[in-house]
Amino acid sequence: MSVFSDISQSQWVLETKYFFVIRDAYPVTQGHSLIISKREVLDYFELNIDEKQDLNTAIEATRDNLVESFGVNDFNIGMNCGKYAGQTVFHFHCHMIPRREGDVEDPRGGVRHSVIGKGYYD
């Protein structure tokens, strides 16, 4: 049983058929949200085709919620699949991180900076 199993529905920001969304307990930015599978699976690669299709619906709904709630329009969307990719909770979840002007000195490269020092390419 994962830590996500203990999350009360009262904490859900929204839900789709196969996912629910909460605000991250340790947000990187204001509004940082987690899209979590209702079925306990390890990572993205264990989702079935219906869940993968519904994930797109959940991402769009989360985006709409964040735009409405926080007035943001830029996002990083990410999944850590496996220990060496940084996954620490082994129950599928997708991070949706709102980005704002000035939240980092130079945002170019975005998720490429997951490996320190390898993000720049120019």
Predicted regions and their residues:
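HIT superfamily nucleotide-processing domains
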Residues: M1-D122
